[in-house]
Amino acid sequence: MRNAFTLLFETIEERKNNPLPQSYTNYLFSKGEDKILKKIGEECSEVIIASKNNDNEELVKEMVDVLYHCFVLLAEKNIPLKDIMEEVTERNGKLSRVGDRREIDTL
């Protein structure tokens, strides 16, 4: 059974391979990687604002926007979703020690 992420990614790849006029996804592909990256940055900022405002409904919507634009980037770079899924699966359940990671600077 395909999940929502798989279906979304398949739709994005379909738009890339068979462009539809007036498609926002095709607009992003036509503008290229810089535009896609800019949109990811904008959407990440909106996630931060929604979280700081304690607006969980808006936070969910903005997180979906981030994921969508990240999926567009993956398609642009010809990285299959299965590569991401495999990486998540590999990391799942691994014990990570705080000392193994860089220090997080406070704001």
Swiss-Prot record:
Superkingdom is Bacteria
Look up the record and give one Gene Ontology term from the biological process aspect.
L-histidine biosynthetic process
Which EC class is this protein assigned?
A: hydrolase
For this protein, what is the EC number?
Answer: 3.6.1.31
GO molecular function annotation:
ATP binding; phosphoribosyl-ATP diphosphatase activity
Q: Which UniProt keywords apply?
A: Amino-acid biosynthesis, ATP-binding, Cytoplasm, Histidine biosynthesis, Hydrolase, Nucleotide-binding
**Gene3D superfamilies reported for this sequence:** MazG-like
Entry's CDD domains? NTP-PPase_HisIE_like (cd11534)
Q: Name one Pfam family in it.
A: PRA-PH
> Which pathway is this protein assigned to?
Amino-acid biosynthesis; L-histidine biosynthesis; L-histidine from 5-phospho-alpha-D-ribose 1-diphosphate: step 2/9
Q: List the subcellular locations.
A: Cytoplasm
Q: Which HAMAP family match?
A: HisE
Q: What is this protein called?
A: Phosphoribosyl-ATP pyrophosphatase
Q: What is the lineage of its organism?
A: Bacteria, Bacillati, Bacillota, Bacilli, Bacillales
